[in-house]
């Protein structure tokens, strides 16, 4: 089917986020400077008669996102390292269409995604970073729009295979970031 930008209904989104900055409380300097987070998000479609995600029935999706960021044990001591993992269900819909990578949004993944990164602060406003993201899809359509043509198929299904569905994507990048 040809993707379209027609009105296909509404969507409800909800997110709960827990973030702890300094998880050691005096146990060690490393833990005192560690940030951890956990996020649970839900999307619920309310399609009109045109259908959304391949059906006119309402579908609920979810996403879990966990991460930790801490001081890098390798000098210089102003560097930080982080690890993040997220998992999205078959009907998960994110609002991350502004993603700026060729691989697409890891948060939109219907499956699992892992990211490891290192950020080096160069000045108060300038930093340098490297990251690696691996996305493994369980269902098709992770970064697509809604319409009836957006039905998610199991990645191992005949429909997915016939349409050349992407099973895995990687993003490796080095970047400079300036904070205004």
Q: Where do the model's predicted regions map?
A:
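Outer-membrane beta-barrel pore domains
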Residues: 1-180
């Amino acid at each position: 089917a040809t993707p379209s930008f027609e009105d296909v209904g509404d969507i409800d989104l909800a997110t709960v986020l827990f973030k702890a900055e300094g998880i050691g409380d005096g146990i060690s300097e490393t833990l005192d400077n560690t940030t951890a987070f956990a996020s649970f998000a839900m999307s619920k479609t309310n399609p009109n008669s045109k259908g959304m995600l391949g059906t006119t029935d309402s579908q609920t999706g979810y996403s879990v996102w966990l991460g930790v960021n801490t001081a890098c044990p390798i000098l210089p001591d102003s560097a930080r390292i982080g690890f993040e993992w997220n998992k999205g269900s078959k009907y998960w819909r994110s609002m991350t269409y502004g993603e700026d990578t060729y691989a697409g949004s890891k948060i939109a993944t219907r499956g699992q995604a892992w990211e490891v990164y290192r950020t080096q602060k160069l000045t108060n406003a300038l930093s340098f970073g490297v990251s690696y993201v691996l996305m493994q899809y369980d269902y098709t359509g992770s970064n697509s729009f809604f319409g009836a043509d957006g039905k998610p198929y199991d990645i191992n299904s005949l429909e997915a295979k016939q349409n050349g569905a992407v099973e895995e994507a990687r993003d490796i990048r080095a970047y400079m970031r300036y904070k205004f």
